[in-house]
Amino acid sequence: MGDDIMPISNLAKESEVRAVKDIPCKNIETDNHLEIGLSSGLSRSKDTSKFKKNSINTIKLIDDIIALHNDPKGNKLLWNDNWQDKIINRDLANIFEKIDESVSELGGLEMYQEMVGVNPYDPTEPVCGLSAQNIFKLMTEGEHAVDPVEMAQTGKIDGNEFAESVDQLSSAKNYVALVNDRRLGHMFLIDIPSNDQETVGYIYQSDLGQGALPPLKIADWLNSRGKDAVSLNKLKKLLSREFNLLSDDEKRALISETLDIHKDVSNVELDRIKRDRGVDIYLTEYDVNNFYENIETLKSKLSNYDKKLSKPK
């Protein structure tokens, strides 16, 4: 895909996907907080246990994201809400300078922690929106910056349109879906990598735990289930109106199988699902080479920053 990110509705001729009407949306918010989850893709096979990723070592990319998250400085580079600039152009010195300014404005670190409740210098545990949107930037940014909030405002489709579209995606291309499930109060990413065998999806997500699912840390998910394929049929059933036709037990089973780290049905609180809310999805093609190069650039930036700090003055 080129540097201009387009929704699937604008890629119909390339992907042979039925065009869908873009609906403007002022903001991407769940009922609790901004989130978006990552991963998951499509599967035309009932058995996904034998499937292996065949892109630019996607497993290594996930491990690199975990490593960046676990590094105190890499963490600050990765989880930031500056959507206007490219993720690889983020400046660590500038990030920490802004933290210093915020702390100073509130009268020092002790006062800041008392008022805000966190130490701003500590590593960030991103809510679902922060993790999903930043990984979306990692995957889709080429020459130009990508604003995931703006993209989703101008190119969203609903769960039924997603279910109709995914079966028609080209198996030779990579796609990513930014999902705002307002029923669950949750956002996550679905990575749909190219494959010459069977098409499946991978979910990237974290969760503050204020919706239908328990709290979830991004590294815990990526280490435990980030490399597990999710079938197309389950994703379509989860995100479309077909979900409403399921029994309560079937709903719990489906949600836990796709989104709970332990696949534990008891972790799903159906009474917290807002049945009158919908699902908004931004589905677009991405270049896996950009994904790889962006992660490598962040790793290099972090390494250079560490070397600079270690030089004697």
Swiss-Prot record:
Taxonomic superkingdom: Bacteria
Location in or out of the cell: Secreted; Host nucleus
The entry's keywords: Host nucleus, Hydrolase, Secreted, Toxin, Virulence
Keyword Secreted: yes
Documented EC number(s): 3.5.1.44
EC primary class: hydrolase
Function: Protein-glutamine deamidase effector that inhibits the host cell cycle and other key cellular processes such as the actin network and programmed-cell death. Acts by mediating the side chain deamidation of 'Gln-40' of host NEDD8, converting it to glutamate, thereby abolishing the activity of cullin-RING-based E3 ubiquitin-protein ligase complexes (CRL complexes). Inactivation of CRL complexes prevents ubiquitination and subsequent degradation of the cyclin-dependent kinase inhibitors CDKN1A/p21 and CDKN1B/p27, leading to G1 and G2 cell cycle arrests in host cells.
Name of the protein in its database record: Protein-glutamine deamidase Cif
Gene that specifies this protein: cif
